[in-house]
Amino acid sequence: MSDKLIRAIAKDGMIRIFATETTELVDEASKIHDCTPTAAAALGRMLTAGTMMGAMLKSDKEVVTLQINGGGMAKGVTVTAYSDCSVKGYIGNPHVDLPLNTENGKLNVGEAIGKNGGLTVIKDLGLKDPYVGQVPIYSGEIAEDLAYYFTASEQIPSAVALGVLVDRDHSIKKAGGFIIQLLPGADELLGDLLTYRLDEIPSLTTMLSEGKTIEEVIEFIFDGMDLKILEEETPKYKCDCSREKVERALLSIGYKDLKELYDEGKEEELKCHFCNKAYKFTKEDIGKLLEEKEKSIADEVSEEMKKAEEKEKEEKNKK
């Protein structure tokens, strides 16, 4: 069964719904990063959340980045998502391994993430400055933290579910999530009804494991609430790294650091955080970048001198 994301509304548009199955996507990411079950659950939940938040974007030029770091052994998770439902991400420590949560017997994502930190959402909407929203970590379980973010930072009452079920061979058995939001003007009793229904249903991964599709899960939750599915898309894990981007990153470091790399004379290998692809740079490659950096610095100095001369002429003319 392939992954799917759906957008829907209910109760005459008073409820907005994003729901997705991300089993294949999370399995691919877990294999790329060689994740333990705990790391796979943490990264998978963030990727699933990112997929749905990417679907909320209105333009293909917009990008949303989610970061969570609570000082735990996972060392933070970062996810970047796009409007076409593509997503990429990485976890600081993919080999974090903790005992199961003693309260519910599930993978202990909350302890792996930690509570001493925050959840940050960065939206690049193509404007001069990105929108940055940040809230303290509520539980570290990610779904609760994201629900708190929507309510506190965006003032949208939201219910969020994120689940990753890891099989015995460390493959991903099921993964998915939903974000349900009450829009302005919705009756408060509607929120109470939703809370009651969500408290009574099995977990999302349980329903998916029983063979329900993501559509059937949402139809089950919103039975009798005038559910309308508006759109379906296929979420995917996609990294857009390239050698050119890595070269730009090298050029962005200071001249002194780049010169040191060149003087060391060793072949440098840089890995993409998101897909682990390695890019190798010989001394000759770094030398070419160094020349480009030197030219850039010379051009900047020349431009500054030109501006200074023009300013000096203007001041003389005033006299």
Curated annotation (Swiss-Prot):
Gene that encodes it: hslO
The keyword DNA repair is assigned to this record: no
Any GO BP: protein refolding
Protein name per the record: 33 kDa chaperonin
A GO molecular function held by the record: protein folding chaperone
Region (Disordered): 300-319
Keywords, comma-separated and alphabetical: Chaperone, Cytoplasm, Disulfide bond, Redox-active center, Zinc
Coiled-coil stretches noted in the UniProt entry, renumbered to this chain: none
GO CC terms, sorted: cytoplasm
Family per record: Belongs to the HSP33 family.
Disulfide bonds: C239-C241, C272-C275
Protein role: Redox regulated molecular chaperone. Protects both thermally unfolding and oxidatively damaged proteins from irreversible aggregation. Plays an important role in the bacterial defense system toward oxidative stress.
Subcellular location: Cytoplasm
Modification note: Under oxidizing conditions two disulfide bonds are formed involving the reactive cysteines. Under reducing conditions zinc is bound to the reactive cysteines and the protein is inactive.
Record InterPro entries: Heat_shock_Hsp33, Heat_shock_Hsp33_C, Heat_shock_Hsp33_N
